[in-house]
Every structure is written in C-alpha cells, then in structure tokens.
Amino acid sequence: MTFDEAGDLLDRMAEKFPEEFYADLNGGISLLPDEMPDPEFPPGEMYILGEYCDDQMGKYILLYYGSFAALAAKEEWTEADWEEELYATLAHEFTHHIEGLAGERGLDLKDEAFLESWHEELDP
C-alpha cells in the first residue's frame, strides 16, 4: 500500500470515530512517511507505529507509514492486514488521548508491561 493509499484509508477510518473522541485533539491526526524503529530493541524487531502526543504544540496523533511499510514487507501483509493494523493503531492512540483527558494511565501501563515482556523474551 502506498503512502497516499494509506492516507486515504486513514482519512476514511478517522471519519468513523465518534466526534467526542476529537475533544481537545487540537493537532488532529497525521500520517508521516517516517520509519520509526524502537531504539530499545534490536534492528527490525520492534517499530513504533503511532504516538499520542501532548506537548507545547497541543494534543495530536502521529502514525508512521514507514513503520507500517517495514512490518508489511517483513510479514507479507495483505490489504486487509493494512486496514486492520491502521485501525488498531488509530484506536490505540485515541485510547491514550481519551485516558489522558480523564487523567488515567491504564493503557500506558499495559504498553509498558507489553514492552517489558518483549525485552524478557529477547533477553531471557
């Protein structure tokens, strides 16, 4: 899937989320061409697919096309796989946003536990 095709798909997906999810998301959702390997893992093992950001620029969601493309090539994704991964990542980042508005950290803690288990698996 090309960058433009992924962007079009992401636009269609974003329109399906409830309006309430966009409360205070003043920076919106951006698809960037970057590949973001996670520096805490061996090369090619883990990629950052998306991020929820809350900083001086505002609140916004970034998705990294290059990371999706790297995994798609490695795992031989179909178009359905692209759709599933983009949707799951967007929903995940929206959850971070909504939890952040509520002062909750449940998904942050779950993410930390997931990454810790990967580290343990790689370095038994």
Show where each model-derived region lies:
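Propeptide-to-catalytic entry region of secreted or membrane-anchored zinc metalloproteases
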Residues: 2-5, 22-40
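Generic alpha-helical secondary structure
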Residues: 3-10, 83, 87
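Zn2+-dependent metallopeptidase catalytic core
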Residues: 9-26
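Active-site scaffold of zinc-dependent metalloenzymes
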Residues: 42-87, 97-123
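PRPP/pyrophosphate-binding module of the type I phosphoribosyltransferase fold
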Residues: 90
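Walker B catalytic acidic pair
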Residues: 93
